[in-house]
Structures are given as C-alpha cells and as structure tokens.
Amino acid sequence: MTARTGLPVNVTEDRSSTSVATGYTTSQRPNLIAGVSLTPPGGRTRLNWINLAAFTPVPGSGYGNAPRNIARGPSLWQADLGLLKHIPLGERFQMQFRGEVFNLFNRAQWGLPLADSSSPATFGQILGMVNSGPVGTGTPRQIQLTLRFMF
C-alpha cells in the first residue's frame, strides 16, 4: 500500500523582469489576503483546488508576502495485491503461479494543481495524473499474471 499527504504547491505570479526589484526573475509570489481561505467556497474539486480569491498581485516592484509552498496538492492512496502459489511437480521440478494487481481499487491519483495566479483561467486546476508513464504509482489498475517453471 502506498499512502501520502499532498505534495507542496508554490503559488506564483509571472511578472516582467523590469517590475522586479532585482530584475533577475519573472516568477514571484503574490500577496496573500488575510482571512481568506485557500480552500475554494464549496470545497476542493479537481477543477478548483486552490482559491484564487486568496491572492492579489503585488503592486509596483515589491515582493509578495505569500509563503513558499503555501498550498498542498491532493493526497495519494493506492493499494496493491499479490498472490503466489507454489505447485510441486515431483522432487526436482516446481511451478509457480503469481498474480499481482496494482491500484487494486482503480482510484484516480491526481497530480498537482496549476498555481500561476497570473493565469486565472487555469489557476487551481488539476489537469494531469501523478504519473503519466505506463508503470508505477498513480497509473490505472494493472493486472500481471506470471507462470514460472523452476528446475
């Protein structure tokens, strides 16, 4: 079984390098509005994970007061199951049958939300899975059967 809390999410805003005091970077943190919850009204959904109303752009060439990694993505929970049967075939030979199921309950494992406050159309949306590869934690249910002959 694999279980973990959500990974940290760093909320940023894109700014012109001329509007940043150092001029070195265009990705800054926005200002956090005191008293406004990071959880959207009505609760979190895959298309509205972080409340955009909790942030405001930084005026002028200052820096935002939103802490680094202020939000958390969705948690991950995945159960795997494996069964094994040894079948003796005389004294010298043996057969082994093994069945494995990964993501037994076929639970969707969502990735991190988009967290660029300068893109309000997609801010807070989760558009992908934890793992987009063919194997590993976060993939859809997979069943693997193995028959092994040992001598």
Indicate residue ranges for each PLM-predicted region.
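Short, solvent-exposed micro-motifs at the edges of structured domains
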Residues: 1-151
